[in-house]
Amino acid sequence: MSAPLLPPPDGDGDFVLREWTLGQILAHTAARFPDRDALVYADRGYRLTWRQFDGLVDRLARGLMALGIQKGEKVAVWATNVPWWIALQFATARIGAILLTVNTNYREHELRYVLGQSECENLFLIDSLRDHNFIETLYSIAPELRVQPRAGGLRSRSLPHLRRVCFLGAEKHRGMFSMPEILALSVMTDEADYQARQASLDPHDAINMQYTSGTTGFPRGVMLTHAGVGLNGYWIGRRQRFTERDRLCLPVPLFHCFGCVLGVLACVNHGAAMVVLESFNPLHVLQAVERERCTALYGVPTMFIAELEHKHFSRFDLSSLRTGIMAGSVCPEPLMRRVVEDMNMREITICYGLTEASPVMTQSDIHDPLPLRCETVGRALPGIEVRVADPEGVEELPRGQAGEILCRGYNVMKGYYKMPEDTARAVSPEGWLRSGDLGVMDENGYLRITGRIKDMIIRGGENVYPREIEEFLLGMPGVLDVQVVGVPSRKYGEEVGAFIIPRPGARPDARSVRDWCRGKIAWHKIPRHVAVVERFPLTASGKIQKYLLRGEAARRWPEAAQEPQAGAAAAEPATTAGAPHGNAAG
């Protein structure tokens, strides 16, 4: 492997397209900083150097090959931020398998769809999260697993492509491999075969698949490449001036790009230590930053609010903090100022992007004036073209004029898995990726988000897609038709609201709708507000005017926009941080 061509130490420097696989990036960092911390779980007493982490990844990769996992197979991981998660991210990359990230909020309905549509062959999972038993959910979808005499070779009627299920721990579960068993198999993989597999990889191979929805239909599997996420992670870290001396506190979910690209790959590219929390808890974040002397911290606005409002906040020494990223939803200036002044994050940055962009298009610089870091989402990362264009085409509009935000470059996805029509709608023949967001770019290239073309709702950093919830609610007895919109909320940015036309004699209300949804779809998708109506506002051609419903929602439920922000994230389950979009990343 040749030495990388890196930019000079100050600023972005000249762009060089460094096309490496993720395995090559890790190997290079392990060779440069073998004895520095790579992965730390402070609450577990778990700590690996780069040499140790690279060795663990090699053993796991060989074990996966011994299981029979082939290049191009999907390997789903349904887990919180456990230590095995990041090892699996690089082990799959080393053998050319595609890591399929699964949201831990998913229930049976969503898991069945994602594993089925992706034609996933392998699943790694933990046992449970809060009141949700992952193993029992899987057994209910694939009951054949419960009666298998041994692990491997699954034949499931509902998931016909799934062959192997692995438990991310030492415990044995019916029909599943354990992690010690997989590591023990590593000696069965011949060195020549292992090296040949790595040599067969192309940096433009798909290596990561994440499911994201649009306003028209169910989630789509976004295929991302080694080069796309690897180089994106490099420049995200570069904008923060990461070096091997930095230590990033990472409390955001790894199943979103915010965790596995902005976090993990930024650190691996620069040799910075990853101080990971399994789930978000504001007290645990403050403890980890102080104990590990973290220099950077990530989070969505509600997470930073919860940390600042924690009753013991003033007791913690956060003087080591320098930089980080706030993303996931709108980042208000008063909050940014508190983070800068009270948490010492004077070089905090803001990102913008979407999963299809690997995920970051633009990011502010640590030296940008604070007003620019509050009012804009920064400038395009090196190697990525960003323009504001006419929504009906791809022609660039004059600076200062609002239009749709597009990007083109190494970061654009390969496409949606087995959805060529959707891919063609998202990416123009010239290679421009449509964001669906509206923005304005100034003369200096700083981008400001002004709205969304899409109807997507962002609740506390989690992307919520109305069409998916509408199709689900149409299965509820008594519901004739339904429209889902975002309701303004000071606490979460937006809440989910549903307008329902009932069947004759039925009278669904908020409680009955929530009861119907509970346990079947992710909690953040369940409507908080419900209104029964006789009809929806229509255009002359019969199309539903959703913008009028959004206005009606704001009038019906004004109290939602007046909820206090203090401690907002603390009252919700641990994974409120989410899939950044809008003023966000991935």
Segments (PLM) and residue ranges:
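Conserved pre-ATP/AMP-binding loop-to-beta segment of ANL
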Residues: E19, P34-D37, S158-L162, C166-H173, ...
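Gly/Ser/Thr-rich phosphate-binding loop
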Residues: L168, I182-V187, N269, R291-G299, ...
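Conserved AMP-binding/adenylation subdomain of ANL enzymes
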Residues: G230-R247, L254-A296, H310-H312
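Conserved ATP/PPi-binding loop(s) of AMP-dependent carboxylate-activating enzymes
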Residues: R379-G383, G393-A426, E462-V464, W557
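AMP-binding/adenylate-forming catalytic core of the ANL superfamily
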Residues: Y106-G116, L123-D127, L297, G409, ...
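Conserved AMP-binding/adenylate-forming core of the ANL superfamily
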Residues: R18, A27, D35-V82, I86-F90, ...
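AMP-binding/adenylate-forming catalytic domain of the ANL superfamily
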Residues: R163, I521-K543, Q562-G567
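Structural core segment of the AMP-binding/adenylate-forming
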Residues: L67, I95-A184, P504-A506
